[in-house]
Amino acid sequence: RTAGFGFNAKSREAQRWATKFAGDRITTINTETKLAVRKIVVDSIREGIPPRDAAKQIREMVGLNRPQGLALRRYVQKLSPSLSPAAKAKAGIKLKNKMIRRRAITIARTEVIDSLSGGVEQAWVQAQQKGLLGSNAKKEWVTTPFGACAICRALNGQSVKITGMFSSEIGPL
């Protein structure tokens, strides 16, 4: 006999989570762009589109954030004075496009993973409500030493109740 419970990456819970929250943490974009990114994330989950492919769609919608814009400006200003204005512009455009690609993949990965995690959490709550998962069940923050930010690495191993929030230096997560 099976428990009658499961989760897959195309879950309705993850899609609902994405519909409600995807894009909320993206800075320096307007509401319309946020809604467009949200739709890409929902479609990505529903259709099983990998974050890298979703990022290709997102990069058409987002620009540089303030720190990236300042870094780009400094880069162009520090280029050799012997370069022609056209060569400087070309180098600047190349770096700008690279920065936007990086930003888009960061957004895609973060928003898809966050939505999938939110969907999993909703599935766990439903499992608890059905008596399939104990009321004392916990979730644990797991990171690898590579690719995770300092905030996430500091949370590694922390466990909280299923509906609880992890405590971080920037507040609850």
Residue ranges and their predicted role:
Residues R1, A89-L173:
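Activation/maturation switch segments at domain boundaries
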Residues R1-K96:
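N-terminal leader/targeting and assembly helices and adjacent pre-domain segments
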